């Protein structure tokens, strides 16, 4: 496996983990009555911290990718235009963070928690994921390993950091909450 494949694999793992955490948060937090929230607070903290962290990482990567494309290609270049169109599409990381914040701010007493977490998950698995798929496809056109290193900001330390956050989510998950089976292997 070459270095670009290793980076692509890590990016894929991060997306799988983020999706699993989003589903687990919805499962555990959307229907939890206010009285139970204190018992699952460690999971809530670990899950939302993971999601906020990973969304911020993807946001940084998109900015670096956009900067690289702007430096390398003229404004009329079709590849640059495709990247800029994808970056301008609905489903940004900032929008996902705003929906995550709304879910966290929802009042369990007012029965808005399930609605807000549902909105977050629908956005995350819909527009955010669609936009990510397109950006991932466009990144495939980067031929140089140095470009991949620069854009991804993946190194041994960042992988350990991601795995530590992932392990914290799994360790604090309520017993009746499950992660999707395809994410448990990593």
Question: What would you call each of these model-derived segments?
Answer:
Residues 1-56, 60-186:
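Small-residue-biased structural context
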